[in-house]
Structure formats: structure tokens, C-alpha cells
Amino acid sequence: MKLRRQGWSRRDVLQLAPATLLGTALNQAACTDKDQATTNSAENRINRVRRFTVTSKRWKVVGKNSHLDVHGDTATDALLIIDTTGGQQGFGWSRSNEGDAAELLDRDPLDFFQPGRGIVSPLGRGDAPLWDLTGKILNEPAWRLLGGYGPEWVPVYDGSIYFSDLQPEYADRGIPRIFEEIDHSLELGHRAFKIKVGRGFKWMAPEPGLVRDIEVVRAIRAHVGPDVKLMVDSNNGYDLATTKRFLKEADIEFFFVEEMFPESVEEDLELKGWIRSRDWNTLVADGESASEPEHFTPYIDRVAFDVLQGDMRRFGFTELRDLARTAAPSGIGLAPHNWGSYLGLYMQLILGRGIPNFVMAEQDPAHTELFDASDFELREGRMRVPDTPGCGLALRTERLADETLDWELHV
């Protein structure tokens, strides 16, 4: 079946009984590890919390999508660093405020870890720093604490193929400029690309915009050949009828189609049925704009999409792991939305090795020397997720002076 060749299928999710038993065993082991760590470090307390705004640099200027103007060449992350009296340090993305962070002070970090449930803390969804810290204290990778269901090598895609052909500085190159960006990413190891469409929503007249969208995706397919995965995302710049016309005239079996129109259960179901009627294996992906997990309930109940795309940073590890559990019996996978973040990629990768129904991680091509990511490796469209305790990244603390300190709390 083509979906299996591409790396993930609904059938994979329906064969999870052994993984569920494994997850139970891992949770029991985590309980034992937690009890032992608590015994050995009864006096370990959180004594310092800092939040920084971290700026990372893209190798290119990312252009427009259907709704927004040029996205630029930088991305920003909210970095929370937690230190303990025992000398451990956990860090990760979190927009938690000073009031919430103050409730961590003088607490045992392991008080917030509940095996089988996750991190329950004043940080709420901004739980990545505590997952990192808990893993380091227990000497376990965070992905194992999340369940350990996923593969060592997690599929990843380049999500940065925007409307470069419409940028004035590339006017003399047009579509070949997009080829340059793709070729660069292919050299880095990517084998999957998400292409923005919807030029006719705002930046061109509707008909010429649609024609250009079709021209671009056809040209990219011809350029990269049949073995590279392609996805499209209109950022709700189409309606259902335009989506069908685009897919029919492009005549490409995309791996998934994302946010093709403002999401609704009925229209997502109609698109799924129309795709199946053409004997395509293309998956329907949606949900990046959701702000609460309850948003997904009717979509999961009726299996209105194939891929759930709750935002990685908005929901965090614990809630996305819970959503994955809810979605798995319906054969729905997770490919969290991630844009405008360096740290978001590595959060997805940890989640991807932790849950059984993870589809692909989205990379924003941002980079910063603040973090050492050398334990991760990109090869042939997949990234190796290491066994390093915590979330796998190392912090170059000497470079923190180059970032903006938002606030600091200490005992």
C-alpha cells in the first residue's frame, strides 16, 4: 500500500496492542525510577527559574503565505531554564509567567511528574522544561517517559516552501528560486516538503493565483522526482470547490493536504470521501488553529481528518500525548504544527519517539548556536532521536549573554 511505503498508515495505528502493553511496563518502570530518585534526592529543590527570549536565524528569507506577508529570516523562542539545589538543570520552550513559575520554587521537581499521566504543574501546557528536568533526574530520555512507542528515526519535513516566486528580490528567478531552496534542503537530508498554496486569496487575482499554484507544485514534482514526499497547505486560502479543482488539475498524489479551507467536520469528510473516490492515498490534515483539546472531539468522533495538527508549543507534551491516545483508536495520526521556532522541532521529535501514531515533524529552518543539537542527526528524511536523558539538547550557557533575559526568580 502506498501509504506504508511513505512511512505511516492508519493500519499501523490499529496494531497498537503490543505497544500499549509496552507503555504500561514503561510507566511502571518510571514509577520505580521516580521512587528511587525521590529517596536518593529528598533535599533536591528548585531554586532558580529564568526566562529568556531567544532569537534564531534562518538561512533564507521566508516569503508570504496566503494570508500573511513576508515571514522574514528570524524566529523567536521563549526559553525557560529551571535549576535545582542538586545541580540539575532543565530547559525548554515555555511562555509561563512569573506568577506560575514562582510556584515551582522550593519544590521537589519530581512532585510534578505523574507516571501514566505526565507533567502536572503550575506551568500548564508550557511543560517542556519540566519534562527535560525530570528525564535528567531519572536518567531517562523524555521520549521514554512519554511512552517510548515511536521509532528511533522520526520522519521530518521542511515546512518553509512559501511564495518565494512573489518576492521582489527574486523576480528575475521566479519558480527556479523555489528549486534553489529545495535543493539546499535536499543537501541537508530532507526528503519531504510542504508547499504553500493560495496565492489567489490575497496576493494575486483568484484565477491566475490558482493557475500559478498548480504550475508551482507540478514544477516541483518534476524537479524532485517521484520519491520525495510533497504536501500542500493553503492556510485556509481555498474553499472546498477550489481545493478539489486544485487537486484534480495538479494531478499529484500528495502525502497530505493541510488547512485547505476553514475547517469544518462536514467539509473535511467530503474532501476525504472525494480523495478516496479517486483512489488516492492522500491524507487530510487539519487543526493547527485549535486552542483547546475539546475542539478536536467532533473531528475524532467522526474521523473527519487523518492527521491532527494541534500546535506543538500551544498544547505541549502532556496534552498532545493525551490527544494522540484519544485519536489512535480512530486511526488518526499526529503531525503537530510548528512554525516560528527552533525548539519546536526538537519537541516534536521527542513526542515522535514517544507516541505510536506520530506522522511527521515540521522544521522551520532556523538555527542558533545557543543549543548543541549534535545528538540528533538528519538523514534521508528522518531525524535520529537520541537516548540522552531529558529532551536531548545541550545548552551552551556561555551564550545566554547574547539573548534577552525576560525575568529571573530564585529562592
Put a short name on every predicted segment:
Residues 1-8:
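N-terminal secretory signal peptides
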Residues 8-26:
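N-terminal export leaders
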Residues 18, 44-56, 323, 340-411:
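Flexible C-terminal active-site loop/helix
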Residues 27-64:
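C-terminal segment of N-terminal export signals and the immediately downstream linker at the start
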Residues 48-53, 82-149:
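Metal- or metallocofactor-binding catalytic centers and their adjacent structured scaffolds
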Residues 87, 139, 257, 299, ...:
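Conserved, mostly hydrophobic/aromatic
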Residues 155-179, 239, 285:
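Active-site mouth loops of central-metabolism enzymes
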Residues 204, 210-339, 344:
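Catalytic core of soluble alpha/beta enzymes
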